[in-house]
Amino acid sequence: MNQIDAIEMAQMKKNIPKFIPGDTIKVQVKIVEGDKSRIQAFQGVCLGRQNGGIRESFTVRKISNGVGVERVFPLHSPSIEAIEVVTRGQVRRAKLYYLRKLRGKASRIKERKYVAGQ
């Protein structure tokens, strides 16, 4: 292992849940305003994951007051406090950019069902 890999491994978070595009996730983001800090939740559908390793990021989309809002989060950012998987979605694509054009019930994602023991 070279020095760059060792530094990257030390900076990577260990407590990240497994999630894939289509999952509804809640991201707890630390926001610092002046000398105060607070935690803000951003809940939406994961549209995709990009890159890998320390540079990995993911895109989350939600509808807020009838307007679509997308946010790209670096996966290993220190400003992310926690990531929670709310529901697991069943999709057949790695990038769900087609959801940007859909409105209302058409933009719903089928929920993935699990069999005990898997």
Curated annotation (Swiss-Prot):
GO MF entries: structural constituent of ribosome
The keyword Magnesium is annotated on this UniProt entry: no
Keywords: Ribonucleoprotein, Ribosomal protein
GO cellular component term of the entry, any: cytosolic large ribosomal subunit
Biological processes per GO annotation: translation
Disulfide topology: none
Entries under Gene3D superfamilies matching the protein: 2.30.30.790
Stored InterPro entries: Ribosomal_bL19, Ribosomal_bL19_CS, Ribosomal_bL19_sf, Translation_prot_SH3-like_sf
One Pfam family here: Ribosomal_L19
Tree of life domain: Bacteria
Described function: This protein is located at the 30S-50S ribosomal subunit interface and may play a role in the structure and function of the aminoacyl-tRNA binding site.
Homology family: Belongs to the bacterial ribosomal protein bL19 family.
Protein name as annotated: Large ribosomal subunit protein bL19
Organism per entry: Citrifermentans bemidjiense (strain ATCC BAA-1014 / DSM 16622 / JCM 12645 / Bem)
